[in-house]
Amino acid sequence: QPRSVRQDQDMNLSKPSPEQTSELMIQAGWYQLEGRHLVFCGDTAAQVFAAWAPLVKLAIAVTGNDWAHDWLIDQAENVVVLPTAEYSDDKLKQLLKLLSKPGDVVMFPWLPSENMLTTAHKLGRTVYAGEENIEKCRWAIAASGLNVTAIEPNYVAELVS
């Protein structure tokens, strides 16, 4: 059973602002956004992220040198690896439009930009994402402006199957 991130507050989680990120209490674990996107705040090279990764139309990996994600090749129809220095929100939008369509599931094993979740959501893609840096994860979730629900790990398996 999903549980709300802040059941005890009257704060409107459907439209959090970056100023409210400290209030969101995002910590390591799984979150569902708007009842459809899954975000893991933790190491995406870990078995807990890879094991439940659905088959996706597109995976966009924006990373430096740290690569322990060979499993992506088996999970995605298309894999795009971008060096962090080459990433831009416009480039993300172009890749999403070129290599996927509304309704497709896309994967982001890193969230270097707080706008990645928002961009994919606005284009009608369903997102399976993660970010090891909890602060970056918190900012991306808050910047999305989407309703946030913390979920138990065993519930993730039901959502992706």
PLM regions: where:
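S-adenosyl-L-methionine-dependent nucleic acid methyltransferase catalytic domains
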Residues: Q1-S161
